[in-house]
Regions:
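Non-catalytic, solvent-exposed segments at the cell envelope interface
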Residues: 2-345
């Protein structure tokens, strides 16, 4: 009878999860063989009016192989363009800009939430408008969005038993408006609880926004590699309870199985990464043509990995030149074909 009770409990948790988290925005068709999903980390701190996504990353996933490219946009990106189909296009025909410089990419969420009349019938206008701006900036069709409230991220990580990952530099806990009261210590294969993982991902002390974007990608990669079917099944009720509090998305329930299948494929492959940050892109005066061409180049490069034929390469003598050992710099690049190299301690 125990297994019957457990199955019933899991079924009830699954029903609650799909009702609370998956808003059913409608099934989308993959664009050119890819699903493009906007991942947003939201933070409604005490010093803020409304929620603003502090991190915005597009996960572009090949529907056949699961091979994934993570494309990050800085929260302070100015003049984000809206596609002509967006309700905000007529209001901001030259991009999201204002005279005081406060019209950054992460402010679009709040603006649209305060102007819900522009999005009649849309459950989350802020997320929808941000998705549209990211489409305009990257040139990608964004199929779905996922919003994670950073306040509850700690609970979500704890629900799966923590996360094991390399911590490539010591990261302060606290800082800014509060006193630094500890550190996430550097080291290989550190097992972090939810509290430590949250601060590793969000800490701004002694680092830049761009380094924070790197750390957030490293946490994403570690979670992806760790979440196997056994973990999900054995801890489903805890995951479901935590997810209801911290995750919202417009992925319809009918697509959950498809997304899980892609995640399982993706975890077996290296993750490519690109960030639209200096020196390539300057957030105050971004070149959106350059952003779009860069996005296409890294996606094409990722696809070519699987399209190459297995041809023998001529043998070359090993290079005896000593190579400098990389240092744990506070600022790491995420322009890479394999994110694990960037995240390594």
């Amino acid at each position: 009878m125990a297994w019957t009770s457990a199955a019933a409990s899991m079924a009830a948790a699954q029903h609650d999860l799909t009702t609370a988290v998956f808003s059913g925005g409608g099934k989308q068709t993959a664009e050119q063989g890819r699903f493009n999903i906007l991942l947003m980390g939201g933070d409604a701190g005490q010093d803020r009016v409304g929620l603003r996504p502090d991190s915005m990353t597009v996960a572009s996933v090949d529907t056949k192989t699961g091979r994934t490219v993570l494309i990050s946009l800085p929260r302070n990106l100015q003049s984000a363009p809206f596609p002509s189909s967006s309700p905000l296009h007529d209001r901001f025909p030259h991009g999201f800009r204002c005279s005081d410089g406060s019209c950054m990419l992460n402010a679009i969420y709040t603006y649209a939430s305060e102007h819900r009349d522009l999005y009649p019938g849309v459950r989350n206008p802020g997320a929808q408008a941000t998705k549209e701006a990211v489409e305009g900036a990257t040139g990608l069709q964004i199929n779905y969005w996922v919003l994670i409230d950073l306040k509850g991220f700690e609970t979500l990580v704890d629900s799966v038993g923590g996360v094991t990952m390399d911590v490539y530099r010591r990261v302060p806990i606290g800082g800014g408006s509060t006193k630094i009261h500890g550190y996430v210590q550097a080291g290989k294969n550190r097992h972090l609880n939810g509290y430590e993982a949250l601060w590793f991902a969000r800490s701004r002390a002694d680092s830049s926004d761009y380094d924070r974007m790197v750390r957030q990608k490293c946490v994403m990669r570690a979670m992806l590699k760790q979440l196997d079917p056994i973990t999900v099944l054995t801890k489903f009720n805890k995951i479901a309870a935590a997810s209801k509090e911290v995750v919202a998305t417009d992925i319809p329930p009918s697509e959950i199985a498809t997304m899980m299948d892609l995640a399982l494929k993706a975890k077996a492959l290296p993750v490519s990464s690109a960030a639209m940050v200096p020196p390539l892109i300057h957030p105050g005066a971004p070149d959106y043509g350059l952003i779009r061409s860069t996005v296409q180049k890294i996606i094409t490069k990722s696809e070519n990995i699987d399209n190459r034929t297995a041809e023998p390469t001529p043998a070359t003598a090993p290079d005896a030149t000593p190579k400098p050992k990389p240092t744990a710099s506070p600022s790491r690049s995420t322009q890479t074909d394999d994110l694990s190299k960037v995240c390594a301690a």
